[in-house]
Amino acid sequence: MLQSSNSFARLLAELQKLPGVGEKTALRLAFHLLKYPENTAALAESLGEVLSRVKFCSVCFGITEEDPCRLCSSDRDETSLCVVEEPQDLLAVERTRAFRGRYHVLQGALSPLNGVTPDRLRIAELMRRLEEGTVREVVIATNFSVEGETTALYLARQIKPLGIRVTRLAHGIPLGSDLEYVDAATVQRALEGRSEL
């Protein structure tokens, strides 16, 4: 029956590549996709559209359909730069409406044990932006995990010699949590209570 279906097995394998999707969830999703083909067709069309239209901004490395993105093209405060790990973290900070500066997305966090070194992140691009001389404060908003803390300390060591103020979000956000899952009020309090590194 299904064990001999190469296409079904491939679908299961591809679904399991998504974060948080194990074997059981992949199976449940696959059966749902088969049961509702009209929804599946709309999902496939939406995925195709995203893959062809959405890209990373060449300035901040957030996601956008136009380059540079809306945030980089706006008249936001150019003297303050918030550095986050992932595009979804940018959205979490932006949801608070407490930060009026610009952003820089690293596209990850340092994790030497997993092979994520500074050259694998958008740190060189960050340093180039800072060397332009417009930014006076960098708000480091990496996650409060071992990797996020390591990244924050590494960035602070790289940025401080440039004479730029380096601050870190306050620890009102629980250790080990990801910004995308924290409510806007908590992120806002953390932004307001940020401290020097």
Curated annotation (Swiss-Prot):
Function recorded in the entry: May play a role in DNA repair. It seems to be involved in an RecBC-independent recombinational process of DNA repair. It may act with RecF and RecO.
Gene3D superfamilies to which the protein is assigned, alphabetical: 3.30.60.80, 3.40.1360.10, 6.10.250.240, RecR Domain 1 (1.10.8.420)
Classification via NCBIfam families: recR
Family label: Belongs to the RecR family.
Zn finger (C4-type) start-end: 57-72
MF terms in GO: DNA binding; zinc ion binding
Protein keywords: DNA damage, DNA recombination, DNA repair, Metal-binding, Zinc, Zinc-finger
Pfam families in the record: RecR_C (PF21175), RecR_HhH (PF21176), RecR_ZnF (PF02132), Toprim_4 (PF13662)
Highest rank taxon of the organism: Bacteria
Name of the featured protein: Recombination protein RecR
Gene Ontology biological process: DNA recombination; DNA repair
Organism: Geobacter metallireducens (strain ATCC 53774 / DSM 7210 / GS-15)
Gene expressing this chain: recR
SMART domains cross-referenced by the UniProt entry: HhH1, TOPRIM
Domain Toprim: 79-174
